[in-house]
A protein has these predicted regions:
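Juxtamembrane intracellular "pre-TM" segments in multi-pass secondary transporters
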Residues: 2-9, 192-223
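Conserved MFS/SLC helix-loop-helix module at the cytosolic interface between two early adjacent transmembrane helices
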Residues: 64-103
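Cytoplasmic helix-loop-helix junction between adjacent transmembrane helices
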Residues: 108-149
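Helix-loop-helix hairpin linking two adjacent transmembrane segments in secondary transporters
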Residues: 104, 142-187
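Paired small-residue
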Residues: 88-95, 103-111, 311-319
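C-terminal transmembrane helical hairpin of 12-TM major facilitator-type secondary transporters
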Residues: 284-330
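Helix-breaking motifs and short loop linkers at transmembrane-helix boundaries and internal kinks
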Residues: 45, 77, 98-104, 115, ...
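A late C-terminal transmembrane helix in Major Facilitator Superfamily
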Residues: 334-370, 379-380
Length: 396
């Protein structure tokens, strides 16, 4: 099988930049939009429910759309489906600027996500095409550093656009991002899977490939771990503002700084992981990171259950989120490495599983009202316990 492991220097930097940008479409399209929700509600003179539905429609399409692009990229190559998806994202973003109907806006957000998810699922497949295990783990870690910076900076940038322009400027910016990404993919990204046997796309063949991927026990192990620890992070993202502001009494400004600090922990650990995987096996890093995260969330829960101490709570949260910088890139690498000829399909299963479970956990956190430390800590602990349970049970 053809392997391109000699990509170095500027060519490698350019490739990582393009793939990281492709992977960051979701946080850029959602987190930059969050500060605009109230303004969108007023602009369309609509209800809060319909305004929130514009977010929900995006998440649903982003999760399900990956199941389409994965198999398509295994048949038609990576580049063409990526270009089609980004073009749809670009076009939908443009129409979001000019329409004046909330129902049309919700539909456009659906198609915006349906296009944007192509970048995420195909970026993972490209890394799997071009790099061997250790190098792939390093590349995934660097991509995730960029992806972690996006949610840190996007809300502030979105707030800036709203303050000086209007909510329409957010989608004008996303349209511009789409143009940039389309041009980069078209001119600077080579087809990474020319070795694939091109065949006519069929539903029967697609289902066959999905069955083939889902029968692989180690793949399911890594996907389950990746999805469960990411769900723990989404529980934190959904419930942390209520806990830190309403329970511990932090101001919105202080919470924003604390949220950024915790995200910085992820960035630092992912950078460390990018260097560690060149000398230490990904499986070994994952093994210890899962155990330490279990200990960290257990301390978080016990502290919350007895008498919540702010500094111990924050230290446990910081450690848990930072450890994702070890766990996320290594589970992704180990899962994707199982399938070199079905990278797109494998990436689709991984992405959809992560996004779907994260959505369910976020809904549970919102539904139960995780506005006290003990509830948030319990949900995070359950996710991490299951992640460890699945990992060690399937490793026997």
């Amino acid at each position: 099988m053809q392997k391109h492991t000699k990509i170095k220097g500027f060519a490698k930097f350019r490739l990582i930049f393009i793939l990281a940008l492709m992977s960051s479409i979701a946080p850029l399209s959602t987190d930059m939009y969050l500060p605009a929700l109230s303004q969108v509600k007023q602009s369309f003179e609509t209800s809060e429910f319909l305004t929130q539905l514009s977010l929900a429609s995006f998440f649903v399409a982003f999760a399900l759309g990956q199941l389409i692009y994965g198999p398509l990229s295994d048949v038609f190559g990576r580049k063409i489906p990526a270009l089609v998806g980004i073009f749809l994202f670009m076009l939908s973003s443009l129409f979001c600027v000019i329409i004046d109907n909330i129902y049309v806006f919700i539909i456009l957000r659906f198609f915006e996500a349906l296009g944007g998810c192509a970048g995420v699922v195909i970026a993972r497949a490209i890394v799997n095409d071009l790099f061997e295990l250790k190098e792939a783990a390093s590349i995934f870690a660097l991509m995730m550093v960029f992806s972690a910076l996006a949610p840190m900076l996007s809300p502030s940038f979105g707030g800036f656009l709203i303050e000086y322009f209007s909510w329409h400027s957010i989608f004008a910016t996303l349209f511009g991002l789409g143009i940039l990404l389309f041009l980069l993919i078209f001119f600077a990204l080579k087809e990474s899977a020319p070795h694939l046997k091109r065949q006519k796309f069929s539903h029967k063949e697609t289902l066959k490939n999905y069955r083939f991927v889902l029968k692989d026990k180690p793949f399911i192990l890594y996907v389950s771990c990746a999805s469960l620890v990411l769900a723990a992070m989404f529980a934190y993202i959904t419930g942390s503002s209520f806990v830190f502001i309403n329970f511990f009494g932090l101001s919105e400004r202080d919470f924003g700084l604390l949220f950024g600090l915790n995200a910085l922990g992820f960035v630092i650990f992912a950078n460390i992981n990018a260097k560690m995987v060149r000398k230490i096996d990904s499986e070994k890093i994952l093994f210890y990171a899962l155990i330490i995260m279990l200990i960290s969330t257990l301390i978080l829960f016990v502290n919350s259950l007895i008498k919540p101490n702010f500094w111990l709570f924050e230290l446990s949260i910081f450690t848990s989120i930072a450890l994702l910088g070890f766990i996320a890139p290594n589970t992704t690498t180990l899962a994707m490495a199982r399938f070199k000829d079905h990278s797109g399909t494998a990436s689709a299963v991984l992405g959809t599983s992560q996004f779907a479970l994260a959505g369910v956990i976020s809904f549970i956190v919102s539904a139960v009202g995780a506005n006290t430390p003990v509830i948030l800590a319990l949900i995070m602990l359950i996710c991490v316990v299951f992640a460890n349970g699945v990992y060690f049970a399937m490793k026997k």
